Amino acid sequence: MALLVLGAGTAWASHRPNNEVLLGGAISQTGQYAEPAGRQVNSIKLWIDEVNGRGGLLGHKVVVRLLDDKSDTQTAIKLYEKLITEDKVDLLLAPYSSGITEAVANVNERYKMPFVAYGAASSPIWEKGRKYIFNIVAVAEDYQKGAVHLAKQIGVQKIAIIGQDSLFPRQAGKGAKDWAKKLGIDVVLEENYPPKQTDFTALLQKIKAAGAEAVISNSYFADAAAQLRQMRELNVNFTLYSSTVGPGLPNFPEQLGNTAEYVLGFSQWEPLP
């Protein structure tokens, strides 16, 4: 972060009290991304407390302005325009999700405002020659690598790959399919569903009918939770079930209880903030 500050210029807004550094971002506080994005907000607040406790960022107190993009791409675009042109933030904080980050990256690129993308993992974001966005997390295509390898180790021969029809889940699914092919596992079903889908009964029955022994679900908190609850209701069981985002969050086992047992998930770091 200090390197980004130095690259952003030496003169922060002189009208701010005591030469404060203003950070700003639009991060989902409501909508489908609120749960994982909330962990991102926690980490930002933790970092600010630690930095200010050490005397600030390069000697300047850090203050933050966090807005709610409501898990909506168009809202995020408008809010980042506002943060840059009206609020005149010194540094930008990245949004959550690959889809929103992909759209917002066009805004910060236009204004030459750098940010580190710590809540987006899809490779296409970094394949367009952009100069002002940086990645620090594993790429989406490798999220299910461990799950597919484990499936191979325990003798699974047929898997289903499902996921929300948005950028990150599609890329995670692409990676899972590639890993399955390398390991000689048969993908008997591939299907993406609308982002707000809540009823997975027909899809789960379709997966079972296809003969899948394991489910690679490229999902977020809400859809993964719904799939697991409905699996239990239908008494549909698989040798392995892996989800990209939901199981790695503390609220997942808290909300699902025993239904979350034996479910695989992914985490970028431990413990979660």
Regions of interest found by a model, annotated:
Residues 22-26, 63-66, 90-95, 113-119, ...:
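Structural recognition of the beta-strand scaffold that forms the well-ordered cores
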Residues 78, 123-124, 131-235, 273:
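Extracellular/periplasmic Venus flytrap/periplasmic-binding protein
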Residues 14-22, 35-42, 54-124, 136, ...:
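Beta-alpha junction/loop-to-helix N-cap segments that form part of ligand/metal-binding clefts
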Residues 32-42, 167-172:
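Glycine- and acidic-residue-enriched helix-capping/strand-helix junction motifs
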Residues 228-273:
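Extracellular/periplasmic periplasmic-binding protein-like sensory domains
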Residues 1-7:
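Bacterial N-terminal signal peptides
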